From Swiss-Prot:
The protein's assembly and partners: Heterodimer of LeuC and LeuD.
Role this protein plays: Catalyzes the isomerization between 2-isopropylmalate and 3-isopropylmalate, via the formation of 2-isopropylmaleate.
Protein name: 3-isopropylmalate dehydratase small subunit
Lineage: Bacteria, Bacillati, Bacillota, Bacilli, Lactobacillales
Pathway it works in: Amino-acid biosynthesis; L-leucine biosynthesis; L-leucine from 3-methyl-2-oxobutanoate: step 2/4
Length: 191
C-alpha cells in the first residue's frame, strides 16, 4: 500500500448525500478481482450517456476537474453493499482522499484498507471546501490530522492504528511481512 503522509491535490465537489456503492461502481463491473481498471467505470451511470460518451453535465467530466484527486461529498457516502470494489474504483480513478460528512462503516473500513483516506467533516466545512477554485490545492496532513486550505485549517479525527498503517503504507499483508523472520524461525523450529 502506498504511504500517505502529506498529500496535495485539487478537489471536486460531488455533494450528493447517500451516494451508494452501486452508484460508485455499478454491479456489472464487479467481475474482476484485480484492483486495477475500475476507475474507468467510476460513477458510470452519471459520467456516461451511452457507449462511454461523456455526460457533459456530470462534474467529473468538466475539464477543470479532470485531475482532481480529492473528492468532497455529502453524508452517508459509500452506503449500500459491502463491495470493496467501490474503494478500488475511487483509488484507480486517482482519488487519494474523500472528505464527506459521514460514511457507511463498511465503506469507511474498505477505503482505509486500500490506502484511500476517508475524512469526516461537518457540513459547514464541506460547504466552505466546495467554494475553493478547481485549481486550488488542498493539503492533507495526516500526521497532524489537518486539511490545509486558503480558507483555513480544519482538524479531522482518525483512529491511531489506521493513521499509523497509512503513514507507514502497511496493509494487513504488509503488517504480517514485518514478522517474516519470526514466522520463518517458528516454521523451522516446528517442522
Amino acid at each position: 500500500m502506498e504511504k500517505f503522509t502529506i498529500y496535495k491535490g485539487t478537489s471536486v465537489p460531488v455533494m450528493n448525500d447517500n451516494i451508494d456503492t452501486d452508484q460508485i461502481i455499478p454491479k456489472q463491473f464487479l467481475k474482476a478481482i484485480d484492483k486495477k481498471g475500475f476507475g474507468k467505470n467510476l460513477f458510470y451511470e452519471w459520467r456516461y450517456l451511452k457507449d462511454y460518451d461523456e455526460n457533459p453535465d456530470f462534474i467529473l467530466n468538466a475539464p477543470k476537474y479532470k485531475k482532481a484527486s480529492l473528492l468532497i461529498s455529502g453524508d452517508n457516502f459509500g452506503s449500500g453493499s459491502s463491495r470493496e470494489h467501490a474503494a478500488w474504483a475511487l483509488s484507480d480513478y486517482g482519488f487519494r482522499a474523500i472528505i464527506a460528512g459521514s460514511y457507511s462503516d463498511i465503506f469507511y473500513n474498505n477505503a482505509l484498507k486500500n490506502g484511500l483516506l476517508p475524512i469526516k467533516q461537518p457540513r459547514e466545512v464541506l460547504n466552505q471546501l466546495t467554494k475553493l477554485s478547481s485549481q486550488e490545492e488542498i493539503t492533507i496532513d495526516l500526521p497532524h490530522q489537518l486539511i490545509i486550505t486558503s480558507l483555513g485549517d480544519f482538524h479531522f479525527e482518525i483512529d491511531p492504528i489506521w493513521k499509523d498503517k497509512l503513514i507507514n503504507g502497511l496493509d494487513d499483508i504488509g503488517i504480517t511481512l514485518q514478522y517474516e523472520e519470526a514466522i520463518s524461525a517458528y516454521e523451522q523450529k516446528n517442522q
